[in-house]
C-alpha cells in the first residue's frame, strides 16, 4: 500500500525525466545545464568568498548565503517569466526599454558608487544594476524591431541605423557611470543580430570598424582604461601596481595545473586576488579544479550557448522570427560575455568587469541571466507547440 502510494507520488517526476524528448514540450537538457551552472556557481562562490567574507563580516559564509538568496530569487522570477507568452514580450518591448532608460538615468542621480563607478540602485535586499536589465531589454527590443521592420533592415540603410540610435542612447548612459564592458557586450550582440537578420555585409564591416575605432578613442580618453590596457600587455612590468590583479590571476592558473589544488584549497583567494568571488571567480576555478575543471565549466556554458543557437535556427526555419532572433541574441550575449570574462582572467583581453554567466557572485547578473534562460525555454516551448499543431505538409509541397 505504501509502495503504491510512493509510486503514485513519484509518477509525475518519472514522466518528466523518462518521457522521450520529442514528446516533451520543453528542452529538459537546457534546464539541467542552467541548474548545473548555478550549482557550480554556488559552490565556487562559497569557496572563493570565504576569506573576504570572514574579514568583512565575521561570518565565513556571508556571501554564500546572499548568493543562495539570489539563486532563490532568480529561480522564482524565472518561473514567473516562463509563463509569459512571447507575444507579450513583443508587444511591450518598447515599454521595457523605456523602463531600462529610466533606471540608467536614475542610477546617475541616486546610484550607489563602488570603486568610483555609480552602477547600482540600493533596493534593501540587494543592489540592482540597471545595466544588466538594459542588456536584456535591448535584445528584446532589437528582436521585436527585426520582426516589425525586417524588410527595411535588409533593404535600406535607414532601417539598419534606427536600432543603432537606441544603442547609442543606452551607451551614453552606460559610459556616464562609467561601464565600457556592458557597452561593448551590447554593441557586439546588436550588430550580430542585425547581421543574422540580413543586414548588408558592407554595413556590418563599417559598423565593426567604427565600433573598434570608438573603443580605442574611449580607452585613450580615460587614464584608468589606458592603465588596464598597458597592464594587460605586460602585467609583470608592474606586478604590485597596475598589473597586480592580472598577475595574481595568472598565478592561480599556474597553480591549478591539470587537476587543481582541490576544492577550497586556493591560495590566491586568501585576499591576494581582488574580486575573487565576482569578476575573477574563473581564476579560482582554475586553481582549485585545474584544467579539467575549467574545461567542464566551459563545456557547460557553451552547451547552453549551442542550445540557444539551435533554438534560434529552428524558430527562424519555421517563421517564428521574434523567438528566433531573441534566442540568437541571448546565445551571442552569453558566448561573448564568457569569452571576455575568461579572457580577462587568463590575460587574453583587458579587464572589463563582466561576470561569468550564472556562476559569478552578483544578484542582478544572476537574476537577469536566469530570466534569459527561462526566455529560451519559453521560445523553445512555443516553437514545439507550433510544430505539433502545424498541419502536415502534402506530398506536392514536400517535392517543391
Swiss-Prot record:
UniProt keyword list: Cell cycle, Cell division, Cell inner membrane, Cell membrane, Cell shape, Cell wall biogenesis/degradation, Glycosyltransferase, Membrane, Peptidoglycan synthesis, Transferase, Transmembrane, Transmembrane helix
Catalytic activity: [GlcNAc-(1->4)-Mur2Ac(oyl-L-Ala-gamma-D-Glu-L-Lys-D-Ala-D-Ala)](n)-di-trans,octa-cis-undecaprenyl diphosphate + beta-D-GlcNAc-(1->4)-Mur2Ac(oyl-L-Ala-gamma-D-Glu-L-Lys-D-Ala-D-Ala)-di-trans,octa-cis-undecaprenyl diphosphate = [GlcNAc-(1->4)-Mur2Ac(oyl-L-Ala-gamma-D-Glu-L-Lys-D-Ala-D-Ala)](n+1)-di-trans,octa-cis-undecaprenyl diphosphate + di-trans,octa-cis-undecaprenyl diphosphate + H(+)
Residue ranges annotated as Cytoplasmic topological domain: 1-29, 82-95, 144-155, 200, 312-321, 378-400
GO molecular function, one term: peptidoglycan glycosyltransferase activity
The protein's enzyme class: transferase
Intracellular or extracellular location(s): Cell inner membrane
InterPro entries hit by this protein: Cell_cycle_FtsW-rel_CS (IPR018365), FtsW (IPR013437), FtsW/RodA (IPR001182)
One GO cellular component, as annotated: cell division site
Keyword Glycosyltransferase attached: yes
Principal cellular location given in the protein's record: membrane
EC code(s) of this entry: 2.4.99.28
Transmembrane segments: 30-50, 61-81, 96-116, 123-143, 156-176, 179-199, 201-221, 291-311, 322-342, 357-377
One BP term from GO: cell wall organization
Membrane-topology descriptor: Multi-pass membrane protein
Stated role: Peptidoglycan polymerase that is essential for cell division.
Family membership noted in the UniProt record: Belongs to the SEDS family. FtsW subfamily.
Protein's name according to its UniProt entry: Probable peptidoglycan glycosyltransferase FtsW
Species in which this protein is naturally found: Aliivibrio salmonicida (strain LFI1238) (Vibrio salmonicida (strain LFI1238))
Origin organism lineage: Bacteria, Pseudomonadati, Pseudomonadota, Gammaproteobacteria, Vibrionales
Amino acid at each position: 500500500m505504501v509502495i503504491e502510494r510512493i509510486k503514485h507520488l513519484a509518477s509525475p517526476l518519472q514522466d518528466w525525466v523518462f518521457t522521450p524528448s520529442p514528446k516533451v514540450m520543453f528542452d529538459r537538457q537546457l534546464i539541467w545545464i542552467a541548474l548545473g551552472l548555478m550549482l557550480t556557481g554556488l559552490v565556487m562562490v562559497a569557496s572563493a568568498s570565504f576569506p573576504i567574507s570572514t574579514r568583512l563580516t565575521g561570518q565565513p559564509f556571508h556571501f554564500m548565503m546572499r548568493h543562495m538568496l539570489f539563486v532563490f530569487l532568480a529561480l522564482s522570477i524565472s518561473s514567473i517569466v516562463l509563463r509569459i507568452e512571447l507575444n507579450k514580450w513583443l508587444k511591450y518591448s518598447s515599454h521595457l526599454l523605456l523602463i531600462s532608460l529610466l533606471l540608467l538615468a536614475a542610477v546617475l542621480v541616486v546610484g550607489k558608487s563602488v570603486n568610483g563607478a555609480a552602477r547600482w540602485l540600493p533596493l534593501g535586499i540587494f543592489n540592482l544594476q540597471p545595466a544588466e536589465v538594459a542588456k536584456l531589454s535591448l535584445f528584446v527590443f532589437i528582436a521585436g524591431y527585426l520582426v516589425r521592420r525586417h524588410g527595411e533592415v535588409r533593404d535600406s540603410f535607414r532601417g539598419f541605423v534606427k536600432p543603432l540610435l537606441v544603442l547609442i542612447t543606452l551607451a551614453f548612459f552606460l559610459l556616464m557611470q562609467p561601464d565600457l564592458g556592458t557597452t561593448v557586450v551590447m554593441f557586439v550582440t546588436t550588430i550580430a543580430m542585425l547581421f543574422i537578420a540580413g543586414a548588408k555585409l558592407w554595413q556590418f564591416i563599417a559598423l565593426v570598424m567604427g565600433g573598434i575605432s570608438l573603443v580605442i578613442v574611449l580607452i585613450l580618453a580615460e587614464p584608468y582604461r589606458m592603465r588596464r590596457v598597458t597592464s594587460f600587455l605586460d602585467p609583470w612590468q608592474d606586478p604590485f601596481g597596475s598589473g597586480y590583479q592580472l598577475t595574481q590571476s595568472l598565478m592561480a592558473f599556474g597553480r591549478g595545473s591539470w587537476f587543481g589544488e582541490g576544492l577550497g584549497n586556493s591560495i590566491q583567494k586568501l585576499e591576494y586576488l581582488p574580486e575573487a568571488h565576482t569578476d575573477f571567480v574563473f581564476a579560482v576555478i582554475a586553481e582549485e579544479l585545474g584544467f579539467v575543471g575549467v574545461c567542464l565549466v566551459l563545456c557547460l556554458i557553451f552547451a547552453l550557448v549551442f542550445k540557444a543557437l539551435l533554438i534560434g535556427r529552428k524558430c527562424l526555419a519555421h517563421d517564428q522570427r521574434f523567438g528566433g532572433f531573441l534566442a540568437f541574441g541571448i546565445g551571442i550575449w552569453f558566448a561573448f560575455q564568457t569569452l571576455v570574462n575568461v579572457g580577462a582572467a587568463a590575460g587574453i583581453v583587458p579587464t572589463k568587469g563582466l561576470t561569468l554567466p550564472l556562476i559569478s557572485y552578483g544578484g542582478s547578473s544572476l537574476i537577469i541571466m536566469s530570466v534569459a534562460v527561462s526566455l529560451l525555454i519559453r521560445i523553445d516551448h512555443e516553437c514545439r507547440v507550433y510544430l505539433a499543431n502545424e498541419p502536415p505538409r502534402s506530398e506536392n509541397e514536400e517535392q517543391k
